[in-house]
Amino acid sequence: MKKTTDQKINLVISADHGGFELKENLKKFLAQKYPELNIIDVGAYEFDAEDDFPDMTSELSEEIYQGKADKGIAICGSGVGASIVANKKKGIRAAVCHDVYSAAQGVQHNNMNVLCMGGRVINISEAENIVSSFLEANFISENKYVRRLNKINKLD
């Protein structure tokens, strides 16, 4: 997380019914461990077995696209659907990560800005570790990573 200590980092978070419980638990964890975060919750705001992940995830992507958020965490049942939807928006680099290595490396090598997870795949303890890896990693601005990122950005 790179902002000065007096600047809040805006993190947008979303979930459908498959990730609602995990999202609510993560919000508590984030508020406690990362007080420098401004957490923007774009839903779901209550458990609804009939809600659809594209609605919440597209709102999450829009927040980042509009510059209202720096990073995002999108949760659905598997993380896959959220990843597909998030990547539809220009400037979004989303990936499903269910381990700490991928979460950190996704940021370090690819400047990933949206972490997608499956609420039916991982438990809260695993999710906390993965989220920490995602938030604490920084893009490595070596030539090869910058070159690759530029190629990715041209695909937008």
Segments predicted by a language model, with ranges:
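A short beta-strand-loop structural module common to alpha/beta enzyme folds
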Residues: L37-A49
